[in-house]
Curated annotation (Swiss-Prot):
Residues 195-209 have a biased composition (Polar residues). This is Uncharacterized protein ZK177.1. It comes from Caenorhabditis elegans. Residues 140-162 have a biased composition (Basic residues). It comes from the Eukaryota. Residues 131-163, 190-209 are annotated as: Disordered.
């Protein structure tokens, strides 16, 4: 099923995602089979097809039916992003929770010893997955220019508009003075170095918010919300930083009264890739086990945001330890 959005997507193809498990037992969890899913690859081409979980434990990837392996740098991080590299710093957010219309997906967690295991499930309906990655240059906004660069760009634009003899001598002297003023230039360089060294989010874009997780959720920011969705109580926090950093948050919840809620923020090591997952059509059956969801938002330099969510229900825990890689192959 192709999706056309203003020229960003074109063409169709078949895509199959395969999951491979690495770890101590090297075994696929029981019942880890998913129904069909629409996969939208955000690099000028729309792909639709099926997601297929195969027990190919001995292979790093597979080339079934001669399909090419699509493995953009950092993509494997997004599949296990819910359970790796927890950040101690509080999340940053400044935009409201979006209403998620339906959920489904795959969820990964770590046990108390830090070993990862997959929470498997059966018959969890899917909607679609959309992936935007580093090679899609048009979908990624450019970093905000430093103040000095903006000034030089404005000067160049002003000079261009004047076209030739329209630039007076006084104007030229003033122009050169702004460009080569050593005091202003050094101050701007020092400011830029300071911002780069601290690696703090842009204060114009991001606000800080604190939360704690000890049984029930407590949060100091009114922009992190509790809300009920079809009998489930979830907590969703938004987090992002500039420079193409990806942040998600992990929420664990149970059907009925909340007896345990956990939130932690994790960050992708990949500084380029941008990924978004959309899953629809909830149809959960809870047999007393906890539900898990990994949700997050990405915003880059204040003018771009994406949604990340991976959700599942679990009846089998700890059956595959290690880390999980997922590869897309397409024709």
């Amino acid at each position: 099923m192709a999706l056309q959005q203003g020229g960003d997507y074109y063409g169709t193809s078949n895509v199959v995602a395969q999951k491979f498990y690495r770890g101590q037992d090297n075994q696929r969890p029981a019942g880890c089979v998913l129904p069909s899913i629409d996969c939208l690859l955000h690099d000028k081409t729309t792909y639709s097809g099926n997601r297929d979980y195969n027990n190919e434990n001995s292979k790093g990837f597979a080339e079934a039916n001669g399909h090419e392996i699509f493995d953009p740098q950092g993509f494997k991080e997004t599949v296990s992003i819910c359970d790796r590299r927890a950040l101690e710093a509080p999340p940053h957010q400044n935009y409201p929770v979006q209403n998620l219309n339906g959920m489904g997906g795959a969820f990964y967690n770590s046990d108390s010893n830090g070993q990862q295991f997959v929470q498997s499930y059966d018959n969890l309906p899917f909607g679609k997955i959309k992936i935007s990655h580093a090679s899609d240059q048009k979908s990624r906004p450019k970093p905000t220019k430093p103040r000095a660069s903006r000034k030089r760009a404005a000067i160049a634009q002003s000079k261009k508009k004047r076209s030739g003899g329209d630039l007076t001598l006084d104007g030229l002297v003033q122009l050169l003075g702004e460009i080569v003023d050593p005091v202003k230039l050094q101050a701007e360089i020092d400011e830029q170095k300071s911002r780069q060294s601290t690696s703090q989010p842009d204060k114009e874009i991001v606000q800080s918010s604190q939360y704690s997780h000890n049984g029930f959720i407590q949060h100091a920011s009114p922009q992190i919300y509790n809300y009920n969705y079809q009998g489930y109580t979830m907590v969703q926090a938004e987090a992002y930083q500039p420079q193409y950093q990806e942040h998600v948050q992990y929420t664990q919840y149970s059907q009925g009264p909340i007896n345990q809620t956990n939130i932690q923020e994790v960050q992708s090591e990949d500084s380029e890739g941008i990924y978004e997952y959309f899953v629809d059509q909830p149809n959960y059956s809870n047999q007393g086990t906890n539900q898990g969801t990994c949700q997050g938002f990405i915003q880059i330099n204040g003018n771009f945001q994406e949604n990340v969510q991976i959700v599942s229900q679990d009846n089998v825990q700890g059956s595959s330890q290690g880390y999980i890689q997922e590869y897309y192959q397409y024709e």
